[in-house]
Swiss-Prot record:
Protein's gene: Galnt3
InterPro entries given in the database record: GalNAc-T, Glyco_trans_2-like, Nucleotide-diphossugar_trans, Ricin_B-like_lectins, Ricin_B_lectin
Protein name: Polypeptide N-acetylgalactosaminyltransferase 3
Annotated Ricin B-type lectin domain residues: 504-630
Cofactor: Mn(2+)
Region (Catalytic subdomain A): 184-293
Record function comment: Catalyzes the initial reaction in O-linked oligosaccharide biosynthesis, the transfer of an N-acetyl-D-galactosamine residue to a serine or threonine residue on the protein receptor. Has activity toward HIV envelope glycoprotein gp120. Has activity towards EA2, MUC2 and MUC5. Probably glycosylates fibronectin in vivo. Glycosylates FGF23.
Amino acid sequence: MAHLKRLVKLHIKRHYHRKFWKLGAVIFFFLVVLILMQREVSVQYSKEESKMERNLKNKNKMLDFMLEAVNNIKDAMPKMQIGAPIKENIDVRERPCLQGYYTAAELKPVFDRPPQDSNAPGASGKPFKITHLSPEEQKEKERGETKHCFNAFASDRISLHRDLGPDTRPPECIEQKFKRCPPLPTTSVIIVFHNEAWSTLLRTVHSVLYSSPAILLKEIILVDDASVDDYLHEKLEEYIKQFSIVKIVRQQERKGLITARLLGAAVATAETLTFLDAHCECFYGWLEPLLARIAENYTAVVSPDIASIDLNTFEFNKPSPYGSNHNRGNFDWSLSFGWESLPDHEKQRRKDETYPIKTPTFAGGLFSISKKYFEHIGSYDEEMEIWGGENIEMSFRVWQCGGQLEIMPCSVVGHVFRSKSPHTFPKGTQVIARNQVRLAEVWMDEYKEIFYRRNTDAAKIVKQKSFGDLSKRFEIKKRLQCKNFTWYLNTIYPEAYVPDLNPVISGYIKSVGQPLCLDVGENNQGGKPLILYTCHGLGGNQYFEYSAQREIRHNIQKELCLHATQGVVQLKACVYKGHRTIAPGEQIWEIRKDQLLYNPLFKMCLSSNGEHPNLVPCDATDLLQKWIFSQND
């Protein structure tokens, strides 16, 4: 029996010896061929290819050969081990992530806010109020208002670390959870400043540090657009040394917001870019909703719900726990940005406050965007100068080229809205018109003529072809296969009023009897009488169109018409809205051959006699009743 066992073992040993000998021969042969393959592959590439490219291609070919060889010989190996599952290829944009939701501990901010004195000036976002100022304090206050166009005196007396009181957002915002998969991207916060007040700039920085999760905030980049104030140089450099996460980059000459933001984006290292102005305060949980939306949709360009910080008292207008009547961005035909209420279809689409608001345009001062997508869609127009028009240009471009522009109501950031800019423009306000022409030429197709009729500076720039080279912007439009402006108006902003592309007459309306023109006056959004003012030929408040319905329209921001009454003529909302509507008699005017403007309802004519234009019995010999409808200069 023992002898039999030895024979069996000897047989098995000889059997597997022959098997492993054959396997060894196969492996030796494989190694020889592999060396020859490597030499052969090396000589196939031209000398112009880089060393890195050759190595990569060699490795790929060798790997293919090795895998094929292994597949051929693996069947000869004893089946002793169950193979590990083969992993599928993962998209490069996806990162490994855990299931579930981020915890509060994971979303802990960069710094904890220091304890606050509830009675301190401006504490909890309350207004700063003082009943009496000394003569010196009054002078300081006036200097600050002149320099910054807000109450810097109040800002300087409010803590840089002030809290904003309880979180007053709606419950669904406070309780909102954020998925770990896909993971929230990191962000670089970019803040451009030019001669900014010390307290507002640093309160913005501290606000970001106290309200942004450390795992998401990669850096704060302060971009100095050639400030001349001493405190914004060595003193600022010294102050931010305490924060390794904050850095400063500087432009040596004033180039404006657009170029400064491009500089900040160029040095940013995070996955997303978040742009803020230098006089902001971030509310609780402001960053996560923005980044979560980008994680869901790579092409989403998202803005926070912008709360107002009072420019006089610095009171923070906190969000309501019951939600609010939100606004979205729009534009008028002078290409100015504005706000409007949400249309009913947008209100119905949103289930609660966590849902984004789709907006035709955005203010452009505060928003987040994927850095790769920012570069993909053409960042900013590098030939736009200083400031103005870049937000409308980006709004049109994002929508027309396949992206989405949204406002996230659960993200709240306060902003000091000034009534005017404290900064001068190195080349004057002409730069704004030039910027607007650049966006109109690229993105508005035939509708650009509506803008040019309303802005004579822009029309001159077009005539002189002084708007610069647009070839790169048109290349972007072609590369991204962007849709036309008709699509934008029909699909994204169907509520927009589109004036006649070819009105019967357009321009200013001048009195023959005196050197004055019809003028709508300041801030006349309807309901106020017209005025008479020195003719300037620049459009704007003196721009009117005579429509096919015989209306005299001033339709730059709203559809407004000359509205006849027994007394002075007013500017009121146009009644005619297209199909199934007609213009009422009060808004119908006839331009007679004798130069009278006749209203058939009252059977009277428009006169320039008096402070306000008014209706009087018609008299063809009265020069004050005669008008010239002329093209703008």
